[in-house]
């Protein structure tokens, strides 16, 4: 979930320590990311060093995460 925070930290409600101040702000960011992930996706380098090469790899990453279950 760290990559959601990195991707949407400027579009959500944050406190001074780069944390979501409300659970709903975090959930809204995650939903927006998942909704928009497939539009023009080519590849991505995630903050943890993971490199996602295509849409299929991104879908597999999401399916394996707790949010994808």
Regions found by a protein language model. Give the residues of each.
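Short aromatic-glycine-(Arg/Gly/Cys) micro-motifs in beta-strand/loop hairpins
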Residues: 1-16
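Generic structural motif
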Residues: 8-10, 23, 49
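Surface-exposed loop/edge segments in extracytoplasmic proteins
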Residues: 13-17, 50-53
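A short, charged, amphipathic alpha-helix used as a generic interaction element across diverse proteins
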Residues: 21-42
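Short, mixed-charge low-complexity intrinsically disordered segments
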Residues: 35-69
């Amino acid at each position: 979930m760290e990559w959601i925070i990195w991707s949407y930290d400027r579009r959500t409600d944050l406190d001074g320590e780069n944390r979501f101040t409300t659970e709903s702000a975090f959930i809204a960011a995650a939903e927006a990311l998942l909704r928009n992930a497939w539009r023009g996706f080519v590849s991505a380098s995630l903050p943890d060093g993971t490199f996602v090469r295509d849409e299929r790899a991104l879908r597999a990453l999401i399916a394996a995460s707790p949010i994808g279950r």
